[in-house]
């Protein structure tokens, strides 16, 4: 045998050298591990800009717009002082503006952006260079999308450059309550700090509430209010605060036209907005009465996703012009709506709608989680399942062969006083093995709860159960696309996220209660898993008896 061993060692083949700089893909393609596989996608900008890069070379008191545009496009971040300067400088300009802006045509009107920075860049391609084009944005720059702070910083930088040709109104998401509930606060803390978030909240309170365009159109984010009789009512609002949950300021940000606008079955001008959980639905007669009283042509608003990016409502009897128009400028909203976006260009008394589609963008896991936080519950559940499968070494016949036991198979053995325990005894070892196996079963159920929570952490949730169909997120983007097939499906599924959210304390309370119920259910299922209990008992009984000498 020694001779064979020596011969095997002498004839041992050398370990082949592996070139780890090359990787063979599933289709046989060789790619370099030292380069980006998808070369047309730029690498993220890892370095924060110097002051020379940040400030414009020709206007050293203003940020370099071209640099910011490309830097944000590559997911770059600014220093905290640079970001804070943009927000605070923009805030000072916004504070100087009245509640009700007035501007003339030509102008391009834009709806919700919702943190879709890459689509915002497409918007400027379609609408025109801000250096040469007048813009009015109707609010909702943040939340839901994962590039909200980039949208704020770039739009505020544009406001610094073009204070008299680019205007920003407030949307219902520009407030502390919604940004805390959705994604913007988390995004600010992840990419910058809470200091940047607080500066943004202060700036949001300075945003004007409405605009009159060309003395013909009232432009607002939400809609009309029973407290809005004349334009003077808007001028008297104290806007420098968190929006209230009722009243004129709330309605300007939250109200919607009735779903059957123009074909109402009620004579009421305003009814409670059951979809939003606050404010009102306003009717066609209410819109016509307001327009006629204020000598206006139409109300231009945003606030609602539209399949085509816009919607023209019923025309008024006196002017033949749409009484209300909705503009929505976030294409493929939440990456599942499959909607077009639109901007409204008004020039020489001619109104044109320009539509555009979504632009590819980098992917973020829900709530800015890293891959380990996201995947650990999935991995943990599978590992514990594998461990239970390994422990289950008994045949079907063995499991059916009941072993006498004085303790219920569904319950772990009760602890024994340590001063009376013989740790070398067979009974002690059997109890320990049995309890450990049952603990693994409970751990498996806990990981299942955590995995379900990970699946549920998505911006698009079903009204039934608060999440997409089980397993959808494990299937990736294709699974989501199959679950949500069209715009109307997505809109119905997402209705609960269009409501005024509950308070922070209520959200925490509900979350803790849901987790407690889920963990109790997991504990109950584990304790009543007769198969696992039988395996635990059978394995523990295989420990040989020990005899004392």
Curated annotation (Swiss-Prot):
Keywords: Calmodulin-binding, Hydrolase, Iron, Metal-binding, Protein phosphatase, Zinc. The keyword Metal-binding applies. The lineage of its organism: Eukaryota, Fungi, Dikarya, Ascomycota, Pezizomycotina. Its EC number is 3.1.3.16. The gene is cnaA. It comes from the Eukaryota. The keyword Zinc applies. Calcium-dependent, calmodulin-stimulated protein phosphatase. This subunit may have a role in the calmodulin activation of calcineurin. Fe cation binds at residues 112, 114, 140. Residues 399-421 are annotated as: Disordered. This is Serine/threonine-protein phosphatase 2B catalytic subunit. Zn(2+) binds at residues 140, 172, 221, 303. PROSITE patterns: SER_THR_PHOSPHATASE. Belongs to the PPP phosphatase family. PP-2B subfamily. Composed of two components (A and B), the A component is the catalytic subunit and the B component confers calcium sensitivity. It is an enzyme of class 3 (hydrolase). It catalyses: O-phospho-L-seryl-[protein] + H2O = L-seryl-[protein] + phosphate; O-phospho-L-threonyl-[protein] + H2O = L-threonyl-[protein] + phosphate. The active site is at 173 (proton donor).
């Amino acid at each position: 045998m020694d001779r064979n061993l020596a011969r095997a060692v002498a004839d041992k083949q050398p370990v082949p050298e592996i070139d780890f700089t090359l990787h063979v893909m599933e289709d046989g393609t060789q790619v370099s591990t030292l380069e980006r596989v998808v070369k047309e996608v730029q690498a993220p900008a890892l370095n924060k800009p110097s002051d020379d890069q940040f400030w414009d070379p020709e206007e050293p008191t203003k940020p370099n717009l071209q640099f910011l545009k490309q830097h944000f496009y590559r997911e770059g971040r600014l220093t905290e002082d640079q970001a804070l300067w943009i927000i605070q400088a923009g805030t000072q300009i916004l504070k100087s503006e009245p509640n009700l802006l007035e501007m003339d045509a030509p102008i391009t009107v834009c709806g919700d952006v919702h943190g879709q920075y890459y689509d915002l860049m497409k918007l400027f391609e379609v609408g025109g260079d801000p250096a040469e084009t007048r813009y009015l944005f109707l609010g909702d720059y943040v939340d839901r999308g994962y590039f909200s702070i980039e949208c704020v910083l770039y739009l505020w930088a544009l406001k610094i450059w073009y204070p008299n040709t680019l205007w920003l109104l407030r949307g219902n998401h520009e407030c502390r309550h919604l940004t805390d509930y959705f994604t913007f606060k988390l995004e600010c803390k992840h990419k910058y700090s809470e200091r940047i978030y607080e500066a943004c909240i202060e700036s949001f309170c300075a945003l004007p509430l409405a605009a009159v365009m060309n003395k013909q159109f009232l432009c607002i984010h939400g809609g009309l209010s029973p407290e809005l009789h004349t334009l003077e009512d808007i001028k008297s609002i104290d806007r420098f605060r968190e929006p209230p949950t009722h009243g004129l300021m709330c309605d300007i940000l939250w109200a919607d036209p009735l779903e059957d606008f123009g074909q109402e079955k009620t004579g009421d001008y305003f009814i409670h907005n059951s979809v939003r959980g606050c404010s009102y639905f306003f009717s066609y007669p209410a819109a016509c009465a307001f327009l006629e009283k204020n000598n206006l042509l139409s109300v231009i608003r945003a606030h609602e996703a539209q399949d085509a990016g816009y919607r023209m409502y019923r025309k008024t009897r006196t002017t033949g012009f749409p009484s209300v128009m909705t503009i929505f400028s976030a294409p493929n909203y939440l990456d599942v709506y499959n909607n077009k976006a639109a901007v409204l260009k008004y020039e020489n008394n001619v109104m044109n709608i320009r539509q555009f589609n979504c632009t590819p963008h980098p992917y973020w896991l829900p709530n800015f989680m890293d891959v380990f936080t996201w995947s650990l519950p999935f991995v943990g559940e599978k590992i514990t399942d594998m461990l239970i499968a390994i422990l289950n070494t008994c045949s079907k016949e063995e499991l059916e062969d009941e072993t006498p036991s004085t303790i219920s198979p569904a319950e772990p053995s009760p602890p024994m006083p340590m001063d009376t325990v013989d740790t070398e005894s067979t009974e002690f070892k059997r109890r320990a093995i049995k309890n450990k196996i049952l603990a693994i079963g409970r751990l498996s159920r806990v990981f299942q709860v955590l995995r379900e929570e990970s699946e549920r952490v998505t911006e698009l949730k079903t009204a039934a159960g608060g999440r997409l169909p089980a397993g959808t997120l494990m299937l990736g983007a294709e699974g989501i696309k199959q679950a949500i097939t069209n715009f109307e499906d997505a809109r119905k599924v997402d209705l609960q996220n269009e409501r005024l959210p509950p308070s922070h304390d209520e959200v925490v309370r509900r979350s803790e209660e849901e987790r407690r119920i889920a963990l109790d259910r997991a504990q109950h299922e584990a304790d009543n898993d007769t198969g696992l209990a039988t395996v635990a008992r059978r394995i523990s009984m295989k420990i040989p008896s020990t005899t004392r000498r």
